[in-house]
Amino acid sequence: MSLVKLESSDEKVFEIEKEIACMSVTIKNMIEDIGESDSPIPLPNVTSTILEKVLDYCRHHHQHPSPQGDDKKDEKRLDDIPPYDRDFCKVDQPTLFELILAANYLDIKPLLDVTCKTVANMIRGKTPEEIRKIFNIKNDFTPEEEEQIRKENEWCEDKGGN
């Protein structure tokens, strides 16, 4: 079991099994490019707090792999988040968004999928006003602009009939 060292943006070094670290395509490519080394792999876009959470996620999924299903079908389902992942994503919004950015940067598709599904579930069924409130977004449209947008997008409104 070989170990690799990862260095967060705030210069904290983590030592982890290479096999687990390689769940990140970015890290796997870095290891392939630079070869095995005692020097830590720098991850300038990930803080130690977030990297620690990401590594916890990777350790768990390395020990408890998810059953392989039909990826295309699973990607579209928002309500099929496994219990561990659901609990993992029960964090404050800034942390959730940092996890999304880290998963994207590190190219860990399952983590990116579950964090994005979590955000999608946060806004499912909400009005634009409710979504603005959830994400603290200022509405900078005039009432006239808003009405025009509503008219242009009437076709995609859910009218309650399935």
Swiss-Prot record:
Transmembrane segments: none annotated. Glycans are attached at P143. The modification N-acetylserine is found at S2. O-linked glycan consists of linear Gal-Gal-Fuc-Gal-GlcNAc. FpaA and fpaB seem to be identically glycosylated. Glycosylation is required for nuclear enrichment. One of its GO terms (biological process) is sorocarp development. GO terms for cellular component: cell cortex; cytoplasm; cytoplasmic SCF ubiquitin ligase complex; nucleus. PANTHER family: SKP1. Belongs to the SKP1 family. Multiprotein complex (SCF) with cullin and F-box-containing protein. Capable of undergoing aggregation. This is SCF ubiquitin ligase complex protein SKP1a. It comes from Dictyostelium discoideum (Social amoeba).
